[in-house]
Regions:
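Domain-level signal for soluble alpha/beta catalytic cores
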Residues: 1-303
Length: 303
């Protein structure tokens, strides 16, 4: 895939993996620490690689790296160093690539690695990524994101997954951090009812502004209730870009207990997912609470 190129999906649907942090937790990782799933990059890299491999074996075409919550600022807040943060960022891509190569050798599959770029609120670990009101300027957000994007891109991912964006302001700040050349990116928002972002922006107005960036290859939603996905895709379809649909399994973040309280570890409904494809979704997967078994069922339904 040429640097700076748009991801040519055509009519092909690629299955994205599920909830990485929730799957790590289900396999014994302690996510109560301030660094959440990023802690496993330092303390349990073999487990990180194993989770990626499990999703690939289940039928995922794309692995999203465990870098969602990795940043210099976040690591310093947790008593770590900038060097630790850079190590974790590079390792997140390397471990996903190792898993892709391992499963390719077994099955002949051609898995892609998407480097996760999560919202600034994930660093604060207080749930503020669910509304995007950080008290930070656009320039400050761009500088924050640029610092880690440079390291991630140097590690050689196939894509960037700019995910769980609560507002258009932060999404545009991330895009301002991108150089002209680099891997294609998808941008996915956390959406709520009636085609709005979690921060209250109308996706119909947001879409064209994001899609205009030359490195944006797809646009959509993640970490969104299944019932709210269709309206979001309808709002974003006029961009003409391939759409992203990666809903969660339902639940709420417990900021005190520092864990998810799931309504149930349900699967992405395969029948609903085929309707999303009809709406233009070409990257379909899951988010929090969606595990490898769920992705296997989804992959079979979309095959």
């Amino acid at each position: 895939m040429a640097p700076g190129s748009r991801l040519d999906l055509g009519d092909r649907v690629r299955v994205v993996d599920g909830g990485f942090g929730s799957t790590l937790e289900a396999r014994g990782a302690d996510l109560a620490a301030p660094l959440w799933s990023a802690q496993a990059l330092l303390d349990a890299p073999d487990l990180v690689a194993a989770v990626h491999a499990a999703f690939f074996r289940a039928g995922a075409d794309v692995a999203v790296t465990a870098s969602y919550q990795v940043s210099v600022e976040g690591f310093r807040r947790a008593g770590r160093t900038a060097t630790d943060a850079a190590t974790a960022l590079r390792r997140s891509v390397a471990l996903a690539r190792t898993a892709a190569d391992e499963v390719r050798a077994e099955q002949g599959s051609d898995g892609l690695v998407a480097a996760s770029v999560g919202p600034y609120g994930a660093v604060l670990a207080d749930g503020s990524e669910y509304h995007g009101r950080y008290g930070r300027s656009a320039a400050e957000l761009t500088a924050f994101h640029r610092e880690r994007i440079v390291v991630l891109e140097d590690a050689g991912p196939d894509l960037l997954a700019v995910e769980t964006m609560p507002t258009v302001a932060e999404a545009l700040a991330v895009l301002d951090a991108l150089d002209a050349d680099g891997p294609p990116a998808w941008v996915s928002f956390m959406a709520v009812a009636d085609g709005r972002t979690a921060g209250g922006d109308e996706l119909a107005a947001v879409g064209p502004r994001v899609a205009a960036h030359p490195r944006v290859a797809a646009i959509g939603v993640n970490c969104t209730a299944e019932a709210d996905v269709a309206a979001a895709l309808e709002a974003l379809a006029p961009t003409g870009l391939p759409l992203v649909a990666c809903p969660n399994a339902g639940g709420e973040w417990d900021a005190v207990g520092r864990c998810w309280r799931y309504a149930g570890l349900g699967a992405v409904d395969e029948g609903v997912a085929t309707r999303w494809v009809a709406q233009g979704a070409r990257l379909v997967g899951g988010c929090c609470g969606v595990g490898p078994d769920d992705i296997a069922a989804l992959a079979a339904a979309l095959d």
